[in-house]
Amino acid sequence: MGGAKPQAQPDVDTSAEGLVALMDAHEIGQVCAVQRAFIYGYDNSYILDAARAYPDRITPVLVVDATDASTPSLLRRLADGQRLGGIRLSAPRANPFSLDWLESPAAMETWQVAEELRLPVAVIFFRTHRERAISALARIAGRFPGVPVVIDHVGVPHGTIYDGEYVAAPESEFHPEGAPNFDLDELVRGLADIRNMFFKVTSINFRRLTAAGIPTASFVRHLADVLGADRLMWGSDVGQTLGPYGPKADAARLAASELSPAERVAFLRDTGARLYMNA
């Protein structure tokens, strides 16, 4: 994953200073900052520097190459020097026939170190390998029960990465399913009994659901009923998904409006803080 030209330049200040200013403006104490690997590759230098500069405000989530034999030692060394929030795994390109990035012998060493360091591992899927990757992830979660496994964009079909050149995919390429199943197929439902599996609901989900005329609050309520409200967390995707933070936060509150007060707090704050910040 050597990086690529972005779909569009971020329309918010994505520097560490800009992020902290945004946090101050919205009275946010801490955030997880996730490496934007499809642009910057596996070089996590800036996000690590930002977290060192603002250790009480920014928690780094690193994107690593699990096929690289040096990754486990790299993670141990970095964890000795500063607090890490977690890691994220993604295929470097859309290849439906290879899961080396997730389940190879080398990748198992990275999973082992994640369990050793108590780091959550987030995973994101391309459309073409989604089914095989979810099946593999279920096996891996069982092998490493001490690792919180976080599926980005819930793992539903409309939350996958568009396969093809790194260009903006039109929303018409995604066809979310409404009631009664809301895109939760048997693959995702089958993860409900794996207690170290968690599901990140993001602005990408909300944008695509809204484009299809599907109420986001009904979607999140259904996720809570099927997967468990304590397994859900919100991710703003600010800096990746275009648009300012405020409307994204408003959309998240709207999506959480059918949750109970306790479920809402867990979804919008507590579950993510517990997994990534030990809060």
Where are the regions a protein language model picked out?
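Short, electropositive alpha-helical surface patch
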Residues: 43-57, 141-147, 218-225, 251-257
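Mid-to-C-terminal alpha-helical segments outside catalytic/metal-binding sites
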Residues: 9-30, 221-222, 226-233, 240-279
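Acidic/histidine-rich helix-loop elements
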Residues: 1-13, 96-99
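Divalent metal-coordination and catalytic microenvironments
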Residues: 23, 47, 60, 87, ...
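Short, acidic/polar
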Residues: 12-22, 68-79, 183-184
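Catalytic pocket-lining loop regions of alpha/beta-barrel enzymes
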Residues: 100-233
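Active-site neighborhood of phospho(di)ester-bond hydrolases with catalytic His/Asp-centered motifs
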Residues: 32-35, 61-62, 88, 150-152, ...
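Active-site gating/metal-coordination segments in enzymes
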Residues: 38-135, 139, 200-203
